[in-house]
Amino acid sequence: MAVRKLKPTSAGRRFQTVSDFEEITRTRPEKSLTVGLTKKSGRNNLGRITSRRRGGGVKRLYRIIDFKRDKTGIEARVAHIEYDPNRTARIALLHYTDGEKRYILAPVGLKQGDVVMSGVNDRNGEVADIMPGNALPMQRIPVGTVIHNIELYPGKGGQLCRAAGTYAQLVAKEGKYALLRLPSGEVRKVLVTCVATVGQVGNVHHESIRLGKAGRNRWLGRRPKVRGVAMNPIDHPLGGGEGRSSGGRHPVSPWGMPAKGYKTRDKKKASSRLIVKRRGQK
């Protein structure tokens, strides 16, 4: 995949860049693996805003992705590489030898016609190779391997490293835990029985995309972000004042929580004991 720069025929297109979508082999999704997506606009079941600055955007179909990779021991052929509007990564449509179809995240190097497999074949004991797109428990993955779509709890499905271009590295194994270096720099313990997929998530040039205009953000369902100092005092702790005031206090959230450098993580959180090195720590 490469990034295409547009001709500056307008102010909005002057700095705009788009993907060339050269890896895409089909435009329409597999109908049996799609469901309608109801827009929530950042509201919860009571209709109250729980995620600000969400709403609008283009209508989408949700593609059902296999994050668990629990169909073990059966080979699958990559039928197509497709675009998914619900995520930054591309997705691959797999045709299993028993006739089932599933979507997975498309890693770097996976192309149409490749064969992938998960886990171990129960009939002949064959283990999936260390190749992009193959999924294995981390106890069977060599130290130093680049992985993505990593489970935090066995059987729950991949939760880490699912965005375009992301990956973690398996740096060590200690007893029942594997040590992973995550994209943030954090080193974390995960059970070796958790499943991960070999390789780096594809569409690595996504970070080079420049939207170029506000309208492209609106297409994605992102609404404008209003500064606290531009609000009224009823709406924000920094609001109000005569003329262009600075807010009169250190930057805070709309609920008064310090916004710059204040640690918000619960010190008693159980998973803290699994974090060997925090992100940003030298």
Swiss-Prot record:
GO terms for molecular function: rRNA binding; structural constituent of ribosome; transferase activity. Residues 230-282 are annotated as: Disordered. One of the primary rRNA binding proteins. Required for association of the 30S and 50S subunits to form the 70S ribosome, for tRNA binding and peptide bond formation. It has been suggested to have peptidyltransferase activity; this is somewhat controversial. Makes several contacts with the 16S rRNA in the 70S ribosome. SUPFAM superfamilies: Nucleic acid-binding proteins, Translation proteins SH3-like domain. It holds the Pfam family Ribosomal_L2_C. Part of the 50S ribosomal subunit. Forms a bridge to the 30S subunit in the 70S ribosome. This is Large ribosomal subunit protein uL2. One of its GO terms (cellular component) is large ribosomal subunit. Residues 265-282 have a biased composition (Basic residues). Belongs to the universal ribosomal protein uL2 family. The keyword Ribosomal protein applies. Disulfide bonds: none annotated. Keywords: Ribonucleoprotein, Ribosomal protein, RNA-binding, rRNA-binding. InterPro entries: NA-bd_OB-fold, Rib_uL2_dom2, Ribosomal_uL2, Ribosomal_uL2_bac/org-type, Ribosomal_uL2_C, Ribosomal_uL2_CS, Ribosomal_uL2_dom3, Ribosomal_uL2_RNA-bd_dom. It comes from Desulfovibrio desulfuricans (strain ATCC 27774 / DSM 6949 / MB). One of its GO terms (biological process) is cytoplasmic translation.
